[in-house]
Design a protein with these regions (language model features):
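N-terminal and secondary-structure boundary signal
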Residues: 1-140
Length: 140
């Protein structure tokens, strides 16, 4: 495990990766993601059987070419890489602006092209259950 993965806070000396993609193609996106993640040890943190949730920045029901949300090609490529690394399930989800219910979330999934990710092994979150969590050490 690299120092970044085990550190609690990031510093100005932590590596930053930028890799040009050129065009939205899943195979090219996979290559770019491998290169992008290499400085922090790649996907070596993924253990066989892991369930991984990707927060996809689905802020609004906008088309992928409007560049307001994470592009479905990048999420499809990342999903494939995570499954190849051993993940049992890759879930894509978010709490987009607006109501957090099935109708609104499906509108966002449709507009942003998230359903395309399902063909690459991703599961779109449709779980709206709530639970209470207590943090007695928290300060207000």
């Amino acid at each position: 495990m690299s120092d970044i993965q085990s550190s609690k806070y990031y510093t100005k000396t932590d590596p930053v990766s930028i890799v040009p993609l050129g065009e939205y193609d899943v195979a090219r996106a996979k290559e770019a993601l491998v290169e992008l993640l290499a400085p922090i040890g790649g996907l070596g943190f993924v253990k066989s059987g892991d369930v991984i949730i990707i927060k996809a920045n689905l802020v609004s029901a906008m088309k992928p070419d409007e560049a307001a949300t994470t592009h479905p090609v990048l999420l499809s490529a990342l999903t494939e890489l995570l499954i190849e690394a051993g993940a049992a399930e890759v879930v894509i989800g978010d709490s987009p602006g607006g109501l957090y219910n099935s109708a609104h979330l499906n509108k966002v999934y449709n507009a942003t092209g998230m359903h395309d990710c399902e063909a690459h092994g991703a599961v779109l979150n449709t779980d709206f259950t709530e639970s209470e969590a207590k943090f007695p050490e928290a300060k207000i």
